[in-house]
């Protein structure tokens, strides 16, 4: 099979889809496949073209060449208007975040891809046997582990925060950090907040998940609570509230001191 790695057209997007980084490309080539990459595809992420060339991948100048030559296209972000102008081929496989199952699909894009006979694989809906999402799980870990650090920054006065430090300071009270949802990202956020020395509470409506979290979060208060109960009982007691994007847990009283 011939694999292709095009550059992403969205601003500030430096990720590469389908795990097609140099070491994985080397594995594909060792198995007899061919891999093309667009010039500069990973330079924004600090990976040079030379690293792809060293493992046997072939460089092309344009995105059009990738689509013309390759059977499998590995992207990361959803298809932009520029992506949709590419020369698709019947039987071609495109793996990227299509977002077609989330109510945001563009009918005109679906029609173009269907008429071209392209097979679309949505990375955001691909799951492991345990139900976790294969491509979003590592991103959830990154987001979860960095969220308390960024949230702690916005607790500072110059960012409109309360002035409470997220790390322990002698003679001062600890920051109280709330995490809405104990999924993978929430668990990672709690581990970071614990490590920083904050007082941490995690809310979830899945008792089995809370029981599991009890085994990995030794200094975190775990609460079985709905969003309405949270809003009434706890929201005003917090310094920092963290929640994954798309969560339905929202309350207007979070204000500038919550992120």
Predicted regions and their residues:
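Short, hinge-like loop/turn segments at secondary-structure boundaries
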Residues: 53-56, 138-141, 218-223
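Rossmann-like NAD(P)-binding element
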Residues: 65-81, 221-259
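Residue-level detector of alpha-helix initiation sites
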Residues: 78, 142, 183-184
């Amino acid at each position: 099979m011939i694999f292709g790695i095009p550059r992403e057209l969205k601003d500030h997007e430096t990720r590469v889809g389908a795990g097609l980084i140099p070491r994985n490309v080397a594995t594909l080539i060792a198995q007899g496949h061919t891999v093309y990459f667009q010039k500069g595809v990973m330079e924004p992420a600090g990976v040079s073209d030379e690293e792809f060339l060293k493992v046997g991948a072939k460089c092309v100048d344009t995105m059009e060449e990738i689509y013309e030559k390759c059977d499998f296209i590995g992207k990361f972000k959803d298809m932009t208007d520029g992506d949709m102008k590419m020369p698709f081929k019947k039987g071609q496989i495109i793996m990227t975040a299509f977002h077609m199952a989330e109510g945001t699909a563009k009918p005109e894009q679906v029609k173009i891809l269907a008429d071209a006979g392209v097979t679309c694989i949505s990375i955001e809906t691909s799951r492991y046997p345990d139900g976790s999402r294969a491509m979003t799980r590592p991103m959830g870990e990154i987001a979860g582990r960095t969220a308390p650090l960024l949230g702690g920054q916005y607790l500072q006065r110059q960012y409109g925060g309360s002035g409470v430090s997220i790390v322990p300071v002698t003679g001062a009270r600890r920051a109280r950090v709330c995490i809405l949802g104990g999924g993978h990202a929430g668990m990672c956020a709690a581990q970071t907040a614990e490590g920083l020395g904050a007082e941490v509470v995690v809310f979830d409506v899945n008792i089995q998940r809370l029981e599991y979290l009890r085994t990995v979060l030794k200094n975190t208060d775990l609460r079985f609570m709905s969003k309405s109960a949270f809003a009434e009982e706890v929201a005003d007691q917090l310094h920092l509230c963290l929640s994954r994007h798309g969560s339905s847990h929202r309350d207007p009283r979070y204000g500038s001191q919550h992120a």
